[in-house]
């Protein structure tokens, strides 16, 4: 779907523009890449820098979601005649699983930064204890996106490296294709249920820590 692809590309320059603007106006967004409140809330960052950064992330996120939808629909609907899913190249599988992870995790990040935006500008208190909110909630939402995001970065590499190894060692086909497909699907699925291992220092109870440690070790 070329127009959809085109739109997902042309959302990126305005996103970059907003990001650059956020570093130019006021004092810039000095929040680190995780954008945790209260450092990213009005108390610590009064100006419009963080707001611009949030809008930039929104545009980049929409762009990624459109790209992911495009990949998934292309692979489902536009394979060559007679090519079943299990006969697809491993790299294509890796990209599809990556696209599904993007599609599932990005809306959660969008929700988290939208809540941060309303906390900053519309007087809500999702992440402000003074109004009954909890800054830890932001960390949960962020890492529910942030952990699958690591696999989004690494999965295409799994596919590529398998192809490179089979090509460079003059094999006829990639070794263990089906096993790799299931392994990538499994790591994609498990990636969604281990997010809190990024936040062991915020005071979770022992049962929760035990679960997240065990689930992480299973990966």
Curated annotation (Swiss-Prot):
Binding site for O2: 151
Keyword DNA-binding annotated: no
Any single GO BP term: electron transport coupled proton transport
EC number: 7.1.1.9
Compartments reported by the entry: Mitochondrion inner membrane
Cofactors demanded by this protein: heme; Cu cation
GO molecular function annotations of the record: cytochrome-c oxidase activity; heme binding; metal ion binding
InterPro entries linked: Cyt_c_oxase-like_su1_dom, Cyt_c_oxase-like_su1_sf, Cyt_C_Oxase_1, Cyt_c_Oxase_su1_BS
Cofactor note: Binds 2 heme A groups non-covalently per subunit. Binds a copper B center.
Membrane topology: Multi-pass membrane protein
Record-annotated membrane-spanning stretches: 2-24, 48-77, 90-119, 135-168, 177-193, 206-219
Domain of life of the native organism: Eukaryota
Cross-link (1'-histidyl-3'-tyrosine (His-Tyr)): 147-151
Catalytic activity, as annotated: 4 Fe(II)-[cytochrome c] + O2 + 8 H(+)(in) = 4 Fe(III)-[cytochrome c] + 2 H2O + 4 H(+)(out)
Mitochondrial intermembrane side: 25-47, 120-134, 194-205
Record text on subunit structure and interactions: Component of the cytochrome c oxidase (complex IV, CIV), a multisubunit enzyme composed of a catalytic core of 3 subunits and several supernumerary subunits. The complex exists as a monomer or a dimer and forms supercomplexes (SCs) in the inner mitochondrial membrane with ubiquinol-cytochrome c oxidoreductase (cytochrome b-c1 complex, complex III, CIII).
Name of the molecule in the record: Cytochrome c oxidase subunit 1
Species assigned in the record: Chrysomela knabi (Leaf beetle)
GN (gene name): COI
